[in-house]
Amino acid sequence: MSQFKSKEEAAESGVYIRKIQSFVKREGRLTKGQEKAIESNWETMGLEHKSGLLDMNEVFGRTAPVVLEIGFGMGKSLVTMAKNEPDKDFIGIEVHRPGIGACLADAQEQGVTNLRVYEHDAVEVLADCIADGSLSRMQLFFPDPWHKKRHHKRRIVQPEFVEKLRGKLAIGGVFHMATDWENYAEHMLEIMAVAPGYKNLSSTSDYVPRPEQRPLTKFEQRGHRLGHGVWDLMFERVA
């Protein structure tokens, strides 16, 4: 790629540069309930990457702080947070269709209306659809740890990613991460400690106790019983 200044420039010359992805798309089968939830709710709750830059006020029909979560899994925690914080608007991004269906089914059942979802690559959504300075909180909970050393480059938390994310957060906005993989927690801390424009909200300059706003998952509860740790990190955009 050295002869090109960007992937876009390479593409214009007919050269394709393979992008390192932080996820592996595992398609799993949709249940009938998940399929029905997508059919019933996508028109009102689904967002399309191809539509480009979002007008948050138009999407949600009001002006409110916006929280974005990358990789919400089956969506239980995201729906719970949206229900518990009705004064905020939530956007979730997930690449696995069964998770999209489960999230929409749960949102419908809970009567949650302040939630929208993308079925797309989060890095592309951030770049093309989220306006600079528009997010009050960014959430990344239990991302794939890519625990083998040779795969660490696939971890989503990298200097380039957190710098791009900083531009999307409002001044005073918070990037909240959580992982149950200690080595990844250390990796996150190492990256964020030197990332410009961020301030660690930990009084000990490392991790924070789980904030009340992040629901305790069944997976975590089981982990606690087995003595497994979970690490939360919160960094505020200050510049």
Swiss-Prot record:
The keyword Methyltransferase applies. Substrate binds at K148, D180, T217, K218, F219, E220. The active site is at D144. S-adenosyl-L-methionine binds at E69, E94, D121, D144. Its EC number is 2.1.1.33. It catalyses: guanosine(46) in tRNA + S-adenosyl-L-methionine = N(7)-methylguanosine(46) in tRNA + S-adenosyl-L-homocysteine. InterPro entries: SAM-dependent_MTases_sf, tRNA_(Gua-N-7)_MeTrfase_Trmb, tRNA_methyltr_TrmB_bact. One of its GO terms (cellular component) is tRNA methyltransferase complex. It is an enzyme of class 2 (transferase). Keywords: Methyltransferase, S-adenosyl-L-methionine, Transferase, tRNA processing. Pathway: tRNA modification; N(7)-methylguanine-tRNA biosynthesis. Gene3D superfamilies: Vaccinia Virus protein VP39. Disulfide bonds: none annotated. The keyword Kinase does not apply. GO terms for molecular function: tRNA (guanine(46)-N7)-methyltransferase activity. Catalyzes the formation of N(7)-methylguanine at position 46 (m7G46) in tRNA. PANTHER family: 3-DEOXY-D-MANNO-OCTULOSONIC-ACID TRANSFERASE/TRNA GUANINE-N 7 - -METHYLTRANSFERASE, PENTACOTRIPEPTIDE-REPEAT REGION OF PRORP DOMAIN-CONTAINING PROTEIN. NCBIfam families: tRNA (guanosine(46)-N7)-methyltransferase TrmB. Belongs to the class I-like SAM-binding methyltransferase superfamily. TrmB family. This is tRNA (guanine-N(7)-)-methyltransferase. It comes from Pseudoalteromonas atlantica (strain T6c / ATCC BAA-1087). The lineage of its organism: Bacteria, Pseudomonadati, Pseudomonadota, Gammaproteobacteria, Alteromonadales. The gene is trmB.
